[in-house]
Each structure stands twice: as structure tokens, then as C-alpha cells.
Curated annotation (Swiss-Prot):
Residues 227-247 are annotated as: Linker. This is Bifunctional protein GlmU. Residues 248-455 are annotated as: N-acetyltransferase. The active site is at 360 (proton acceptor).
Length: 455
């Protein structure tokens, strides 16, 4: 049994006061329409048609690479008119119709609507809400059958009291759409062609109307302005947080936790406030993430501690390692078991060996550091000569004294020691002491200048 999908995405979204279409506003780091497309793609439809209008090129660019047919609605004359533009591109099968600005609709709810709607039925997704203001109302007869959908601007006082609303999501066979869409008239306050009129046509043709409901009310919430967008962001994030907590993770405050990608978690983790997850992140068991941390496209193994105000991007933090506070681990780092990237340490494309420590105020770039090394405060690997990047290699058990500069390319041998304040531009053999700084002198005849006093 095949399925076509129509996503309506032609609206301007004037209340967003933006230079991009409403459906390209972002929620959890994805555009609204990407959320919708991701949900319908899981239904494995034969084709997806997106009806565009305002700034159509931007919408097409955002969905580039997906198996989507774009149809341009030159004049925004209503939802019925929009679906009519898509009609020639649909196959002779059931059609699922939904909106590009309703981002939280789940695949499960859509699948239920499609599966329970026969080819000769009209499927309608409705919901009961406490505040139906601004939404189309579902009107039923005395037997409970749906008779029509009335938009709020066209509703009378009695109809405005109805709390069952139209979500705008339908499932109907193309054959019925071919019959009904040309019959829609713009005889309403807005002078638009409402898709909701197909309810009236279905009743007239004695077509059975199949009504289903969403699992959660938030799934059918649309976005018209930035206030609604922010509210929906919190709904999304709270829902994600609850799913994560159900897997055995403690979150200090679910209202101050953001996932902008995918998070795979182990058990007994602790996540403090204002943590942001970007891209694909995996946490092992017993991981502790301090406040104000950002984790992006990284793997954090068991028993790791990421202390507050730290960032880990595109790297692996091995079991029992410690990062932070105020540390930045940039892409392509591998922090081995029990190693320490301490406060105000930045690492980029660096391997920090098992048990090694860089505890304070250090830059490690393009480096390979062995096991059980000590990198003192203020150490800098000088990896860039103005044109190319070069590598620093430090052997196991090496000791790099504070405030030293290692001019790459350079090798520090196993067990070697670099004296504090040294600038090392040549390789240091194993177990040697390297020191390069001016000899200390004491000048016993020196006198401190006397401050001039005001006259």
C-alpha cells in the first residue's frame, strides 16, 4: 500500500519578522520543516511533495539532497489551493497532508492516521485543547459525527466554545482530492480556498470520516512567532530530558538542558545545569558533566568528569579522565584513561597519554604525548610557523616545566625533563635535562628608583 506526502510550506511567517521563511526557523538546531520531513521519511512514502512560496529557493536549499519534489505556489490563496498545486505530482494512492511549521508531530501519530484510514475514507487528526483560540473547530452532529471544520474567524459564539480543534493534518486518497479540490470556493472572510471544506464534501458524498488524535498535545502545536517558537523549544527539550532521565541519568534541572542533536547515554550519569549537547554525543556510565558545558560530536567513556564551563568537540575522552574546569578540547583529540586536561587548557588534534596531566593554562596543538607525563602551567606547543602546522612528540614519563615553549617540529624523549621557562627548538634525548634560559644574576649594587613626589 503506497503513500504520498504533501507538506505545505508556502507561508511568509510575517510575525517572525525575519529574512527567511517561517519553516526555516530552527528548533533544537534543526529547521522546522526538517523536523517534519524527518518524521514522514520514517513512513517510507513513495514521494514527498513540498509546496513552497515565499523565498522558495531558501527552502529548497535547506532540503537539498533529500528525495523531495518542490512545487511553487505563486499566490498564497489558501491551503486548498496549495494542495491543488501538488495534485499533478501525486500518485494514485493515499495522500498524507501536513504542515511545515508543526515540527513536533511524531511518526507514530502519522502512522496511526494512515493505517486507520481506508482508501475510500477521509482521515482527520483532531485534538482537544484547553485554549483553542485562533484554531479551527471540529463541529459534530448530535450523533457525534464530524460535519464540518469552522475557522475561528468564521465561527459563531457557540462554535467558539468548542475545544476540539482541527490540526490541519489529513489522510485522503488522491481520487477524492481530484474530485473535491476544484469544488472549493473562497466564500469566507479571508477569501481563501480552505482545505477544511473537504469535510463538507465528504459528508455530502457519504464518505466515512476517520478521526484520530495525537499522543501528546504538543505534537500538533504550530509556530507563528518567536514567542511560540521559544515555548515549543522548551517543550521539545523537556520531552528529550525526560526520555534521558528514564534511561538512568540525573539532570539537575531539565528546564536548563538542551539537546541539539542526538545523545546516547549510559547509566548513573549526572548532568548539571546549562549543559548543551550538539551533534552526536555518547556518554558512558557514571559520567559527571558540570555546569555550563558544551559537548559536540564526542565520545565520553565511563567515569569521566567534565568540570564546569568546559567544551569538548569532536574528540574522545577515555575512561576516568578529567577535563576542566574552563577547558577546551577541540577536534581530533584523544584524552587517554586517567589523563587530565585542567583549567584553562586548550587542546587541538592532540593525544594525551594514559595518566598524563596538563593541569593549568596550557596550549597543546598537533601533539602526541605519552603516558604519565607532566605538562606544567603555561606550556605552549608552538605548532604553526605562519604557513604550516607541525607536530610535537613527547615520550612517556617526560616532565615539561612551567612556562616552556616547544617549537615544533620537536621530539622530547622518554623520561626527559624540560626546565621551567625554556624555549625548546631542538629534539631532547631520553632521560636528559633540557634548559634554555638566561643565567640568573644578582646585582647587589642595584637600587630601586625612588618615586617622585608632588610638589
Amino acid at each position: 500500500m503506497g503513500l504520498s506526502v504533501v507538506i505545505l510550506a508556502a507561508g511568509k511567517g510575517s510575525r517572525m519578522n525575519s529574512n527567511k521563511p517561517k519553516v526555516l526557523q530552527t528548533l533544537a538546531a534543526k529547521t522546522l520543516i526538517e523536523h517534519v520531513v524527518s518524521s514522514v521519511e520514517k513512513l517510507n512514502p513513495d514521494n514527498i511533495v513540498v509546496v513552497t512560496g515565499h523565498l522558495k529557493e531558501q527552502v529548497e536549499d535547506a532540503l537539498q539532497g533529500r528525495n523531495i519534489t518542490f512545487v511553487y505556489q505563486q499566490q498564497q490563496l489558501g491551503t486548498g489551493h496549495a494542495v491543488l498545486q501538488a495534485l499533478p505530482y501525486l500518485k494514485e494512492q493515499k495522500v498524507l497532508i501536513l504542515y511545515g511549521d508543526v515540527p513536533l508531530i511524531s511518526t507514530e501519530v502519522l502512522e496511526n492516521l494512515v493505517d486507520t484510514t481506508n482508501d475510500d475514507d477521509l482521515g482527520v487528526l483532531t485534538a482537544f485543547v484547553e485554549n483553542p483560540q485562533g484554531l479551527g473547530r471540529i463541529v459534530r452532529d448530535k450523533f457525534g459525527a464530524v460535519t464540518e471544520i469552522v475557522e475561528e474567524k468564521d465561527a459563531n459564539d457557540i462554535q467558539r466554545q468548542i475545544k476540539e480543534i482541527n490540526t490541519g493534518i489529513y489522510c485522503v486518497h488522491k481520487n477524492l482530492l481530484q474530485k473535491w479540490l476544484p469544488e472549493i470556493k473562497a466564500n469566507n472572510v479571508q477569501k481563501e480556498y480552505y482545505l477544511t471544506d473537504i469535510i463538507t464534501f465528504a459528508k455530502a458524498d457519504h464518505v466515512s470520516i476517520n478521526v484520530t488524535h495525537p499522543i501528546n498535545e504538543f505534537e500538533i502545536l504550530g509556530v507563528n512567532d518567536r514567542t511560540q517558537l521559544a515555548s515549543l523549544e522548551r517543550v521539545w527539550q523537556r520531552n528529550v530530558a525526560e526520555k534521558i532521565m528514564a534511561k538512568g541519568v540525573s539532570i539537575a534541572d531539565p528546564n536548563r538542558f538542551d539537546v541539539r542533536g542526538n545523545l546516547d547515554v549510559g547509566k548513573d550519569c549526572w548532568i548539571d545545569i546549562n549543559v548543551i549537547i550538539k551533534g552526536n554525543v555518547k556518554l558512558g556510565n557514571n559520567v559527571v558533566i558540570g555546569a555550563n558545558c558544551i559537548l559536540k560530536n564526542c565520545i565520553i567513556e565511563d567515569n569521566v568528569r567534565i568540570k564546569s564551563n568546559s567544551m569538548v568537540d569532536g574528540s574522545i575522552i577515555r575512561e576516568g579522565a578529567i577535563v576542566g574546569p574552563f577547558a577546551r578540547v577541540r577536534p581530533e583529540c584523544d584524552v587517554k584513561e586517567g589523563a587530565v586536561i585542567g583549567n584553562f587548557v586548550e587542546a587541538k588534534k592532540t593525544i594525551l597519554g594514559k595518566g598524563s596531566k596538563a593541569s593549568h593554562l596550557t596550549y597543546l596543538g598537533d601533539s602526541e604525548i605519552g603516558a604519565n607525563c607532566n605538562i606544567g602551567a603555561g606550556v605552549i606547543t608552538c605548532n604553526y610557523d605562519g604557513v604550516n602546522k607541525h607536530k610535537t612528540v613527547i615520550g612517556d614519563y617526560a616532565f615539561i616545566g612551567s612556562d616552556s615553549q616547544l617549537i615544533a617540529p620537536v621530539n622530547i624523549g622518554q623520561g626527559a625533563t624540560v626546565g621551567a621557562g625554556s624555549t625548546i627548538a631542538k629534539d631532547v634525548p631520553a632521560d636528559n635535562l633540557a634548559i634554555s634560559r638566561a643565567r640568573q644574576r644578582h646585582i647587589d649594587t642595584w637600587q630601586r628608583p625612588v618615586k617622585k613626589t608632588d610638589k
